[in-house]
A protein has these predicted regions:
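Acidic, His- and aromatic-enriched active-site or binding-groove loops in soluble protein domains
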Residues: 107-109, 210, 235-255, 296
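Aromatic-rich carbohydrate-recognition surfaces in CAZymes
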Residues: 202-207, 211, 219, 235, ...
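Active-site neighborhood of glycoside hydrolase catalytic domains
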Residues: 241, 245-251, 261-271, 275-310
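Active-site-proximal beta-strand/loop segments in catalytic clefts of secreted hydrolases
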Residues: 164-167, 220-225, 272-277, 309-310
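Acidic (Asp/Glu)-rich catalytic clusters
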Residues: 153-155, 207-214, 247, 259-266
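A general structural detector for well-ordered alpha-helical segments in enzyme core domains, enriched
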Residues: 149-153, 202-209, 238, 242, ...
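Glycine-rich, acidic and aromatic/proline-enriched surface loops and short helix-turn segments
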Residues: 164-168, 203-215, 241-249
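Extracellular and organelle-lumenal recognition/adhesion modules and their flexible linkers in secreted
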Residues: 1-199, 216, 229-234, 240, ...
Length: 310
């Protein structure tokens, strides 16, 4: 999903937010992507062909850990390079396999930089698909994956409650794509902002952030208004399953999934809002939505408090 873009790109194109270099070709491949619609593909005959992303911010002395998923053929393996001014770090990565396989790496920055670049390359001949590129400083890993400066800024606001998903994002959000192993999560095309969310921040991360900040979570459910081809009953079921994932015991159907994701104890989310800005439904239409969702959601957990839009 990291390489997806809207509107659809041609096959012979560089992935969004990356630039290509070298004599080979960079393509968008939809044959067998890792978990979205497309992956980046490097097709090279000689020399060095790769993808680069910049600018990245590095702090001297900070350790960074990353990973990427690859499949294909490259007898000479892959190269990973980080450049920051005069400092250059190069790592050799193993040759890809026919099936998707994760490659991990780490490095300690030897210089401060606001314009560092990350390069992923095939040295010589190869045909390699790449997806799910990730890079995170240890400082963020220590907070559970959150940017320390951003977490500190939010903490300074002392929010008693945090609402999520928020805005138009909530109206199309499918929560099941945002749980489980990061590299297995589905993509979320946010067409209104011409963007793609890789779902690295999902329900478990939201609850974790709220607990770090001492804020009460408020979850907004998707009522399916923008998906007329799907029966509303499917969205009601999805909302109830979300409640069970958050609040059900570890031996319930979705409580087992939560426990398998490392959280055996129920979250006890009390506040649930039925949809976001519902201007397209009209007053009577939204009343009908609430009348359909509310009884089912209360049946899933009678202790919850439901909120409706004004």
């Amino acid at each position: 999903p990291l390489f997806e873009g809207l509107p659809p790109l041609s096959r012979d194109a560089t992935p969004r937010h990356w630039r290509s270099y070298g004599s080979g070709k960079i393509l968008l491949d939809d044959g067998r992507p890792k978990n979205g619609r497309i992956a980046a593909r490097i097709a090279a005959e000689s020399g060095e062909t790769g993808l680069a992303q910049a600018p990245l911010c590095l702090r001297k002395g900070e350790t960074y850990r990353g990973s990427l998923w690859t499949r294909g053929t490259a007898p000479g393996g892959l190269l990973l390079r980080v450049t920051a001014g005069d400092w250059v770090m190069t790592r050799a990565l193993p040759a890809p396999a026919p099936e998707w396989r994760e490659a991990r790496f780490e490095f300690t920055a030897k210089a401060d930089a606001g314009d560092a670049a990350l390069q992923i390359a095939v040295p010589g001949q190869g045909d390699v698909c790449i997806d799910q590129v990730s890079l995170m400083p240890d400082a963020a890993a220590a907070t559970g994956g959150f940017r320390p400066d951003l977490l500190e800024a939010i903490a300074g606001l002392r929010p008693p409650l945090i609402r999520w998903p928020g805005g138009c994002y909530a109206e199309r959000y499918r929560w099941k794509d945002g749980i489980g192993p990061q590299a297995a999560r589905g993509r979320f095309p946010v067409s209104i902002w011409d963007d793609i969310d890789t779902n690295s921040y999902g329900t478990d991360e939201f609850i974790a952030m709220c607990r770090k900040l001492g804020a009460e979570p408020l979850i907004v459910i998707n009522a399916g208004r923008h998906d007329p081809g799907t029966p509303r009953a499917d969205y009601i079921k999805e909302a109830c399953e979300w409640i069970e994932y958050c609040n059900g015991p570890a031996d319930s159907a979705w409580g087992k999934v939560r426990a398998a994701n490392g959280h055996p104890e129920p979250y006890g989310v009390r506040l649930w809002e039925i949809d976001n800005e519902t201007w397209s439904a009209g007053v009577e239409g939204y009343i009908a939505i609430v009348k359909e969702f509310a009884p089912a959601m209360r049946a899933a957990d009678p202790s919850i408090v439901l909120l409706a839009c004004g």
